[in-house]
Amino acid sequence: MLFGRETSLKVADQIVGSARDAGVNFIDTANGYAGGASEKAVGKLIAKDREHWVLATKGAATIGPGPFDRGISRKALTKFLDDSLQRLNVDYIDLYYLHKDDEHRPLEETVATLGDMIRAGKIRHWGLSNFRGWRHVEAIRIADKLGVPHPAASQPYYNAMNRMPETEILPACTHHGIGVVPYSPLARGVLTGKYTPGEKPGTSSRAGRGDRRIMETEFRDESLVMAQTIKSHAESRGMTAGAFALRWVLHNTLVTSVLAGPRTMAHWKGYLSALESGFTEEDEALVNQLVPMGHPSTPGYNDPQYAILGRPVRPYA
């Protein structure tokens, strides 16, 4: 996500090289990251050994003001994919996610388009990102109806501050054989413990910039206190808070892989360190005490980018 924007190509190359040396072969980007610059950077970084990498990218997020600069229609997705292939400088993409749902649009056209992309050899598999549990099942039903392969992976926002995917998304994916690849295991940086309760965040941070998605979800004093509790516990175990948070996600047997978004080599090494420590029953109990299974860290935790649709009201008297 940060490659091509906050992370220079030189540093990104060092991170990718270190990842490859550590046995990593799965790399993820999106057409909307850094205005397309992230895809261009990833394409350059994997060009010398393309076949080593399982390459994932995403389409459907808003990238401009035009009517087909967003959404999951055939016309929009076709343009998104062709542009991604060009920026990545590849002939095919291993895993192509729908980055965002459009719950007001029937999925038949979308799934049929993805099937055509597979038959054309432009993508190998498709997946869903930020889709609700019932929409996963609907996508599978339509895929069966149209003779299209099932989605191979789901990319939910899942971490110790947001355990809501445990109620529907993760069980549904497991039941239907869909891999689960959570993003933002550090809860947009909150789980690193870098934010101090009661103190104004740094201007260069996501919270300091007033990003609505963090301000209306994790950035509340209760959550920041929880993050500090996790940080203290992790340090008593000889781990960083970030490594603990990543390890917590990976300890869930329903999780297939996890996305790391390092900005620096130090960040990347911090992610890798999560694999060096075990996870104990006491570790699990601590998080359960702070954030119960299936719940977010605080009441009213709603990502403004994904509206709650379960209460349309009748006309008032």
Spans of features found by a protein language model:
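N-terminal binding-site loop/beta-alpha segment at the start of enzyme catalytic domains
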Residues: 1-54, 119
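Glycine/proline-rich, positively charged
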Residues: 4, 21, 64-164, 168, ...
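Conserved, mostly hydrophobic/aromatic
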Residues: 12, 27, 42, 55, ...
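Generic structural signal for well-ordered alpha-helices
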Residues: 16, 39, 43, 81-85, ...
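A short, structured active-site edge motif that brings together acidic residues
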Residues: 52-64, 155-156
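Glycine-rich beta-alpha junction loops
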Residues: 59-61, 132, 158-162, 184-191, ...
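Aromatic-lined glycan-binding groove of carbohydrate-active enzymes
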Residues: 165-205, 240
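Terminal-tail/helix-coil boundary detector
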Residues: 203-232, 236, 254-255, 265, ...
